[in-house]
Amino acid sequence: KKDGYPVEYDRAY
């Protein structure tokens, strides 16, 4: 996960 991405991206990243 990276700062700047929404929570939905937290699962993909």
From Swiss-Prot:
This is Bradykinin-potentiating peptide T. Expressed by the venom gland. Disulfide bonds: none annotated. The lineage of its organism: Eukaryota, Metazoa, Ecdysozoa, Arthropoda, Chelicerata. Its main location: secreted. It is found in: Secreted. GO terms for biological process: regulation of blood pressure. One of its GO terms (cellular component) is extracellular region. Acts as a bradykinin-potentiating peptide (BPP). Induces endothelium-dependent vasodilation that is reverted by NO synthase inhibitor, suggesting it activates molecular targets on vascular endothelium leading to NO production and vasodilation. It appears to induce vasodilation through muscarinic acetylcholine receptor (AChR) M2 (CHRM2). Does not inhibit the angiotensin-converting enzyme (ACE). Does not act via bradykinin B2 receptor. It comes from Tityus serrulatus. Belongs to the non-disulfide-bridged peptide (NDBP) superfamily. Scorpion BPP (group 1) family. GO terms for molecular function: peptidase inhibitor activity; toxin activity. Keywords: G-protein coupled acetylcholine receptor impairing toxin, G-protein coupled receptor impairing toxin, Hypotensive agent, Metalloenzyme inhibitor, Metalloprotease inhibitor, Protease inhibitor, Secreted, Toxin.
